[in-house]
Amino acid sequence: MIVKIWDVIEGPIAAAECPEEGPEEANWYMVCRAEVDGIIADDNFWFEDFDDAYEWQKHFMKTIEPLIIDMSVMAGYN
């Protein structure tokens, strides 16, 4: 499954501040505008490391091009 991230709406935010439970190893999350199969919605994306999350934030400070993630190659997703 291909996910396109179009924008960071909010974050990085400490995972402890999230009302929903995320992955056990996640310390940070961001609310992002994402597209899956042509449908766009805001969703939470989880990160172990603040710097990894902030890389997404920096991407959108420079460009409006989406980040493209192939979830089929990520552990725990199919």
Q: What are these model-predicted stretches?
A:
Residues 21-44:
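A short, structured beta-strand/loop element
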Residues 1-29, 70-71:
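Short N-terminal "domain-start" leader segments
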Residues 37-55, 60, 73:
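A short, exposed loop/beta-hairpin motif centered on an aromatic-Gly-Thr core
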Residues 10, 29-32, 48, 59:
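Secondary-structure boundary/capping motif
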